[in-house]
Amino acid sequence: MDKKPLDVLISATGLWMSRTGTLHKIKHYEVSRSKIYIEMACGDHLVVNNSRSCRTARAFRHHKYRKTCKRCRVSDEDINNFLTRSTEGKTSVKVKVVSAPKVKKAMPKSVSRAPKPLENPVSAKASTDTSRSVPSPAKSTPNSPVPTSAPAPSLTRSQLDRVEALLSPEDKISLNIAKPFRELESELVTRRKNDFQRLYTNDREDYLGKLERDITKFFVDRDFLEIKSPILIPAEYVERMGINNDTELSKQIFRVDKNLCLRPMLAPTLYNYLRKLDRILPDPIKIFEVGPCYRKESDGKEHLEEFTMVNFCQMGSGCTRENLESLIKEFLDYLEIDFEIVGDSCMVYGDTLDIMHGDLELSSAVVGPVPLDREWGIDKPWIGAGFGLERLLKVMHGFKNIKRASRSESYYNGISTNL
């Protein structure tokens, strides 16, 4: 079945959804050959690619959103239309919409739940070449299938959460087995302790630290200059990136005081380095940085409040989309990660190239110049992209939750430390 372009999807609902999942009511929009010019009821304006594969188009097809824009005053009827409208099929579902979501009451631990199979399949491409610079996940103890001779005992939600925390991506364990929770927990704890023993004996390298070193080597070997900039930045830098108090991203900034904040991205200081190095270094200028960033995120499954980014950029000659895509391909092939490139847009840069692994966005890449460049004194062509290292690790090692790849006291290399 053909995917409908974005203009058809928004025409069917009269709504627009931002990158943060906020539904806006559209006041007016115009469609050119490849662009859509949108004016929201709240007064915001947007120019986006008329794409079939961008994040917003996918969300429209799956009828998913997080909240509504209060200034747009999206009605229940509008939401009902968004949830039930199908532009790719003739089947419709009647949905009852209420203004506020209902809060589910917590189920007491004494109430039993029906057992369900729990499995953590590895989603990343398996690597058998141990000579590569990318670390391979620690091997778990081989799993022997357990015969099912009696009905499985019911597990509470907290017990299921405990089992999920102890599972490794290589475990293939079904909860439809006649094992009490304590016995199952004991078996998984033993496996994880064995994993730690092997890791301590054979490797001793943290996945995130190892990936940082491998990425640094990749870019230095390709003549990029490594940058290490301050984590505390002037709040004015954020405003110059177009993030003012009216934007959604502004609410995610960790502010130290009225003049300083923790950097939410690496771009501001890289902009400054490009401007200064342009007076010193020969053409083209190629720089990169690997370091932590901070945002107040609410969606914990794919986002972290403290995360690690790599941003690379080149300014001057050779700054074409073809060269950017070639470098991205070389980088992800180096990490043995499958991907596809789709067009999208963002509030800061406008048109972007989204680097996707399935439904997971790995990066947004940009071909400059863009209007924002004037704020930083940049007047030359440039290309660049940013990747979240924890997301790369999640794909590389098949982690179900991104917290397993993060700076954490609860997990080490994806293994629970609460044993």
From Swiss-Prot:
Its main location: cytoplasm. It catalyses: tRNA(Pyl) + L-pyrrolysine + ATP = L-pyrrolysyl-tRNA(Pyl) + AMP + diphosphate. Disulfide bonds: none annotated. SUPFAM superfamilies: Class II aaRS and biotin synthetases. InterPro entries: aa-tRNA-synth_II, aa-tRNA-synth_II/BPL/LPL, Phenylalanyl-tRNA_Synthase, Pyrrolysyl-tRNA_ligase, Pyrrolysyl-tRNA_ligase_C, Pyrrolysyl-tRNA_ligase_N. Residues 101-157 are annotated as: Disordered. One of its GO terms (molecular function) is pyrrolysyl-tRNA synthetase activity. One of its GO terms (biological process) is tRNA aminoacylation for protein translation. It is found in: Cytoplasm. Residues 125-143 have a biased composition (Polar residues). Its EC number is 6.1.1.26. Keywords: Aminoacyl-tRNA synthetase, ATP-binding, Cytoplasm, Ligase, Nucleotide-binding, Protein biosynthesis. Belongs to the class-II aminoacyl-tRNA synthetase family. Catalyzes the attachment of pyrrolysine to tRNA(Pyl). Pyrrolysine is a lysine derivative encoded by the termination codon UAG. This is Pyrrolysine--tRNA ligase. It comes from Methanosarcina barkeri (strain Fusaro / DSM 804). The lineage of its organism: Archaea, Methanobacteriati, Methanobacteriota, Stenosarchaea group, Methanomicrobia.
